[in-house]
A protein has these predicted regions:
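Short Pro/Gly-enriched beta-strand edge/turn motifs at strand-loop
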Residues: 1-14, 153-161
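Conserved beta-strand hairpin/beta-sheet module of binuclear metal-dependent hydrolase folds
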Residues: 5-53, 168, 172-187
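Active-site neighborhood of divalent metal-dependent phosphoester bond hydrolases
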Residues: 94-120
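Active-site-proximal loop/helix segment associated with metal-binding centers of metalloenzymes
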Residues: 104-107, 129-181
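Glycine- and Gly-Pro-enriched alpha-helical subdomains that act as flexible
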Residues: 190-192
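Short hydrophobic-aromatic micro-motifs
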Residues: 36-38, 88, 133-142, 184-187
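General small-molecule cofactor/ligand-binding pocket signal
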Residues: 5, 89, 123-128, 138-140
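Active-site metal-binding motif and surrounding structural segment of the metallo-beta-lactamase
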Residues: 45-90, 95-96
């Protein structure tokens, strides 16, 4: 059985005024006896909401980061302070590059804090291919692009060897959770 809770997004507070919102995303789910987080939003607000919902971050077994943009990894520092043991599954490319958005007047850096990866390297599992996390949870690492990318990607850039290039979402990780009557797919930003 799957138990899934949205911890942070940009709309959750309309249901409960005590829950915080932000441009970002974080899910908590339980399956196969595991407590997991998928993304951490842009800040530590996910932890406020987890506490209000009775979810204990220190008991999380696995954290999956969907990609290297800070609206999904911004709460990582807080998570690492609160949870001392969970493995963190992420694409091998998520912390490798600098990511920029041009949705505003000036370009903004939306990269994850790579110093956390360096400091806590032993906690990270770098994905280069799909991975079976548990009997019912599959991590799907993005690899082939044989379709048009979403229109929103036109505002995103990646810096490779000092040169800006169009963002190709090679760092995305989606979740597939098998349940009794089908599957649940979590794709945080769906850049690909």
């Amino acid at each position: 059985m799957l138990d899934l809770t949205v911890l942070i997004d940009n709309n959750a507070a309309f249901l409960d005024k005590e829950l915080l919102t932000e441009h970002g995303l974080s899910f908590y789910f339980r399956v196969d006896g595991l407590a997991c987080l998928y993304d951490l939003g842009a800040s530590d607000k996910w932890l406020n909401n987890a506490n209000k919902l009775g979810i204990h971050a220190e008991e999380v077994d696995h954290l999956i980061l969907s990609h290297g943009h800070k609206d999904h990894t911004g709460g990582l520092s807080t998570f690492l302070q609160v949870n001392k043991s969970a493995k963190i599954f992420v694409s091998d490319k998520a912390f490798k590059y600098k990511y920029l958005t041009y949705r505003h007047e000036k370009p903004r850096d939306i990269s994850s804090d790579s110093s956390l990866f360096a400091k806590y390297a032993d906690r990270f599992v770098l994905l280069t291919e799909d991975c079976l996390l548990s009997p019912h949870v599959y991590l799907i690492h993005n690899r082939v692009f044989e379709h048009r990318l979403p229109v929103g990607n036109q505002f995103l850039r990646i810096v490779v060897d000092g040169e800006e290039k169009p963002y190709i979402p090679h760092d995305e990780v989606a979740l597939v959770i098998r349940i009794d009557d089908g599957i649940v797919i979590l794709s945080a930003c769906s850049h690909s």
